């Protein structure tokens, strides 16, 4: 395996990389860096987490060291990704006098103009704000020799394809080296490549990455009204270190986040209406383990590069294969195992088959956990928490109450009663989620079939026949009967085929 120095990287940059813990290049870095140093256009197909920032960032540092003025422009789909890329570039170039400036919406443009006037070598930004600066002439393009588009398919999905074309047209073509990285290559991106890139060197690592068995993919069949309870049962059994949960709409994210918090889970939500300050706060909590569940829409999660995500839950099934690929790519990184679970209504199974056909691999059916498994998982979790609680000093007033209770009740009965309340506390919390219609059944051409209900209000959960808002559905059980270990499970329903999580662990 070649090291960075053998690829042509300077001692100063190699020293910075080693201080960051990077001893050897990743496959995409090994394949990209030599061509990037030669000024050859690069078309890289790779998912987030493969080291693609280093693939374009490391050689870029080599090219801009000692230069004056804006030498390179990097486009990213989101503010978070722009900030992450900029931070990595600063680390790569530590001590070499390279200035990196970020420009994106949601922040005062005057501050960005002031930073641009200082002549940074590298500008990283989102398409909309970059165009603002181009129109104001606060971003000069005459000295730019390297244009990089990171996660180009995500920018396209967010409606930036025309912005990308506008920006590429503004950078002088004669001296420009273009590097475009994308997890997928839809036709619009291919057209962009054909129009603006010069015989690019194609570097592809996506197929190997996505066939990597580090990510185990499951689906579980569940009706909409039972989805939330099934989901929280999985959370109790899986005990994810960090989990990202995907909802289809902003309302779904808000309601799902509130429901999880009311059940005692450490969760926060992200969607397009969240302010930049709040987004940064939520992401900081997630990265620092203050919360372990992040609920997000596809758009809000784009560009996030968070390590350590153990589970991805598709609470709502994605409408296309590309979204599915990006969702599950948030887990199973850096050699760690990941689990992706997709909740699917019986009439949505066509979407599962479409994803399987497109990716060339099957998902495993996963039966929802039994009540006994859920309670056992909760009990194990409570035992672990009790061990932590016992290591802390209790307040004197609580010790006084404890003494009074122990004098009045048998100690075993007292502890058992308290544990029972802790284990079953979640069951007493009522939550409300607005009913969401399943996706339309797909026809033979892969598109939603039929137009019978296109203009019909039948089945629309939002309004009743008098156009009054529905109250949605509740996850609270109608029966308040306590669970009895000897009680037989309902034999009237046929068990769903597939493995339980306990089977999976075996």
Swiss-Prot record:
Family matches, as Pfam families: DEAD, Helicase_C
Subcellular location: Cytoplasm
BP-aspect Gene Ontology terms: response to cold; RNA catabolic process
Residues annotated as domain Helicase C-terminal: 214-375
A single GO molecular function term of this UniProt record: ATP hydrolysis activity
The keyword Transmembrane appears for this protein: no
Annotated catalysed reactions: ATP + H2O = ADP + phosphate + H(+)
Its EC number(s): 3.6.4.13
Annotated CDD domains: DEADc, SF2_C_DEAD
Phenotype reported upon loss of the gene: In strain S30, cold-sensitive; decreased growth at 30 degrees Celsius, no growth at 20 degrees Celsius. Reduced biofilm formation, increased hemolytic activity, increased stability of mRNAs of the agrBDCA operon. A double agrA-cshA mutation has wild-type biofilm and hemolytic activity (all phenotypes in strain S30).
Miscellaneous comment: All disruption phenotypes were also seen for deletion in strain SA564.
Protein's name in the database: DEAD-box ATP-dependent RNA helicase CshA
Organism: Staphylococcus aureus (strain NCTC 8325 / PS 47)
Gene from which this protein is expressed: cshA
């Amino acid at each position: 395996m070649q090291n960075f120095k053998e690829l042509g990287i300077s001692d100063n940059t190699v020293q910075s990389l080693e201080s960051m813990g990077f001893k050897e290049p990743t496959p995409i870095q090994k394949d990209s860096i030599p061509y990037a140093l030669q000024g050859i256009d690069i078309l890289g197909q790779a998912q987030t987490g493969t080291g693609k920032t280093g693939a374009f960032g490391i050689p870029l540092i080599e090219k801009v060291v000692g230069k004056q003025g804006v030498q390179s422009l990097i486009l990213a789909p989101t503010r978070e990704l722009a900030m992450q890329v900029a931070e990595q570039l600063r680390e790569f170039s530590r001590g070499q006098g390279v200035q990196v400036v970020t420009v994106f919406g949601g922040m005062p443009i005057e501050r960005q103009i002031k930073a641009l006037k200082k002549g940074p070598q590298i500008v990283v930004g989102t398409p909309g704000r970059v165009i603002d600066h181009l129109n104001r002439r606060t971003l000069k393009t005459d000295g730019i020799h390297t244009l990089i588009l990171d996660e180009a398919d995500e920018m396209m999905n967010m409606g930036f394809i025309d912005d990308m074309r506008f920006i590429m047209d503004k950078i002088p073509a004669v001296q420009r080296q273009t590097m475009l990285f994308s997890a997928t290559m839809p036709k619009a991106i291919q057209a962009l490549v054909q129009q603006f890139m010069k015989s690019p060197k194609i570097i592809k690592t996506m197929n190997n990455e996505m066939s990597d068995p580090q990510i185990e993919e499951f689906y579980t069949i569940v009706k909409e009204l039972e989805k939330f309870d099934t989901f929280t049962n999985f959370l109790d059994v899986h005990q994810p270190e960090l989990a990202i949960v995907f909802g289809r709409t902003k309302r779904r994210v808000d309601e799902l986040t509130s429901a999880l918090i009311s059940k005692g889970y450490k969760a926060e939500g992200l969607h397009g209406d969240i302010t930049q300050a709040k987004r940064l706060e939520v992401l900081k909590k997630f990265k620092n383990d203050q919360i372990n569940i992040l609920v997000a829409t596809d758009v809000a999660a784009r560009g996030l590069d968070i390590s350590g995500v153990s589970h991805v839950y598709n609470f709502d099934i994605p409408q296309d294969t590309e979204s599915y690929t990006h969702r599950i790519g948030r887990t199973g990184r850096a050699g760690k195992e990941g689990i992706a679970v997709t909740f699917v209504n019986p009439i949505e199974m066509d979407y599962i088959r479409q994803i399987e056909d497109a990716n060339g691999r099957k998902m495993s059916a996963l039966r929802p956990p039994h009540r006994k498994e859920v309670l056992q998982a909760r009990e194990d979790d409570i035992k672990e928490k009790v061990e932590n609680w016992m290591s802390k000093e209790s307040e004197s007033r609580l010790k006084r109450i404890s003494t009074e209770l122990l004098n009045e009740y048998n100690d075993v009965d007292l502890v058992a009663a308290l544990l029972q309340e802790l284990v079953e506390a979640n069951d007493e919390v009522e939550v409300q989620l607005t009913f969401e219609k399943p996706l339309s059944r797909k026809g033979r051409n892969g598109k939603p079939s039929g137009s019978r209900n296109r203009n019909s209000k039948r089945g629309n959960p939002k309004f009743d026949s008098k156009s009054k808002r529905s109250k949605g559905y509740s996850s609270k059980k109608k029966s308040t009967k306590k669970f009895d270990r000897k009680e037989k499970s309902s034999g009237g329903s046929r068990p769903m085929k597939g493995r339980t999580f306990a089977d999976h662990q075996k």
